[in-house]
């Protein structure tokens, strides 16, 4: 089983899309093993997006993601990194496919509703910014028999 880190940005929370987004993951057999609602600190945001420091959109991105509550989660399924990236769509909503979360609901590249780790290495780095190991809950998901 593979895990990945996902968080819903403040505009997803403020627009009432949390349930819709989680539903799309669960309908695909993706298991949530950690979940929390909180305000991201500037320090957390800077650690998460450290690779973008110095880019023209960096400050706007940090201000945006710390400007409202977010929902962070760790999810699990076979090939979950690839599956989640497919479900959420391209970073640019105009390039995101029809039926993807960003394709249907996102407005701009910065305000694209959701972030998901793009590799196992980034998952390992990113989830540790927000979760401790004892916050990951292992349990049996009935749909696992079908995967």
From Swiss-Prot:
The active site is at residue 115. One of its GO terms (cellular component) is cytoplasm. It is an enzyme of class 2 (transferase). Signal peptide: none annotated. The keyword Kinase applies. It is found in: Cytoplasm. It catalyses: a 2'-deoxyribonucleoside 5'-diphosphate + ATP = a 2'-deoxyribonucleoside 5'-triphosphate + ADP; a ribonucleoside 5'-diphosphate + ATP = a ribonucleoside 5'-triphosphate + ADP. Pfam families: NDK. PROSITE patterns: NDPK, NDPK_LIKE. Its EC number is 2.7.4.6. The keyword Chaperone does not apply. Belongs to the NDK family. Homotetramer. This is Nucleoside diphosphate kinase. It comes from Thermosipho melanesiensis (strain DSM 12029 / CIP 104789 / BI429).
């Amino acid at each position: 089983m593979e895990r990945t880190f996902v968080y819903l940005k403040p505009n997803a929370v403020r627009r009432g899309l949390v349930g819709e987004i989680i539903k799309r993951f669960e309908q695909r057999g993706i298991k949530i093993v950690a979940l929390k609602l909180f305000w991201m600190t500037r320090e957390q945001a800077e650690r998460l997006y450290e690779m973008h420091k110095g880019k023209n959109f960096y400050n706007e991105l940090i201000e945006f993601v710390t400007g409202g509550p977010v929902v962070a989660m760790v999810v699990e399924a076979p090939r979950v990194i690839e599956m989640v990236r497919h479900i959420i769509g391209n970073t640019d909503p105009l390039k995101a496919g029809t039926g993807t979360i960003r394709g249907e609901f996102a407005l701009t590249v910065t305000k694209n509703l959701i972030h998901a780790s793009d590799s196992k290495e980034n998952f390992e780095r990113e989830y540790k910014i927000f979760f401790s190991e004892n916050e990951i809950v292992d349990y049996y998901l009935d749909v696992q028999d079908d995967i």
